[in-house]
Amino acid sequence: MSLPGKFITLEGVDGAGKSTHVGFVAEWLRGQGREVIVTREPGGTALGETLRELLLHREMAADTELLLMFAARQQHLAELILPALARGAWVVSDRFTDASYAYQCGGRRIAAERIAALEDWVQRGFAPDLTLLFDVPPAVAEERRSSVRAADRFEQEAGSFFARVRDAYLVRARAEPHRIHVLDARQTIDAVQAEIARLLQDLT
């Protein structure tokens, strides 16, 4: 699927610090004269934000969680992402489908084949142009999580859950090195953002 705009996603375990860099990516691109839409998953649309509240704060079966994630993603694509890209805007999303492989496959241990089937149905070959994966060891991420706001349903998971999530992310990165770039998020913010700027320059 060829569209005039570009789609950039930011990924990482809770506590990796990716949300810190969403604004930097958007402002850097705006500085290049791009129209930029910043969004997130789950969420990004009115329906998606309603589903986000359910996903973050209500107990549910793992398969239910996965299906709701992709329901929100379908609406996100149809209502926001694809129309924006079609008019030439650049879309920057805090999480996308790699998070489903990390959290629902790695963390929840749902078979990757189930996620791939949903991905194929919902996305029909569509994928980000660039994914920035912010990586930190589980202990560092846990320390960062404990120092912020009240934890949501995912953030309350055990360290072993996040270790599986991280491993699943790194498996994805090794499988798609042309798209997914792993950033050592233990570095200073300035060092990480210098690396981000280099990757954005290559894309533009």
From Swiss-Prot:
<keyword id="KW-0418">Kinase</keyword>
<dbReference type="InterPro" id="IPR018094">
    <property type="entry name" value="Thymidylate_kinase"/>
</dbReference>
<dbReference type="GO" id="GO:0006227">
    <property type="term" value="P:dUDP biosynthetic process"/>
</dbReference>
<keyword id="KW-0545">Nucleotide biosynthesis</keyword>
<comment type="function">
    <text>Phosphorylation of dTMP to form dTDP in both de novo and salvage pathways of dTTP synthesis.</text>
</comment>
<dbReference type="GO" id="GO:0005829">
    <property type="term" value="C:cytosol"/>
</dbReference>
<dbReference type="Pfam" id="PF02223">
    <property type="entry name" value="Thymidylate_kin"/>
</dbReference>
<comment type="similarity">
    <text>Belongs to the thymidylate kinase family.</text>
</comment>
<dbReference type="GO" id="GO:0006235">
    <property type="term" value="P:dTTP biosynthetic process"/>
</dbReference>
<dbReference type="InterPro" id="IPR027417">
    <property type="entry name" value="P-loop_NTPase"/>
</dbReference>
<protein>
    <recommendedName>
        <fullName>Thymidylate kinase</fullName>
        <ecNumber>2.7.4.9</ecNumber>
    </recommendedName>
</protein>
<dbReference type="GO" id="GO:0005524">
    <property type="term" value="F:ATP binding"/>
</dbReference>
<dbReference type="GO" id="GO:0006233">
    <property type="term" value="P:dTDP biosynthetic process"/>
</dbReference>
<keyword id="KW-0067">ATP-binding</keyword>
<keyword id="KW-0808">Transferase</keyword>
<keyword id="KW-0547">Nucleotide-binding</keyword>
<feature type="binding site">
    <location>
        <begin position="12"/>
        <end position="19"/>
    </location>
    <ligand>
        <name>ATP</name>
    </ligand>
</feature>
<dbReference type="InterPro" id="IPR039430">
    <property type="entry name" value="Thymidylate_kin-like_dom"/>
</dbReference>
<dbReference type="GO" id="GO:0004798">
    <property type="term" value="F:dTMP kinase activity"/>
</dbReference>
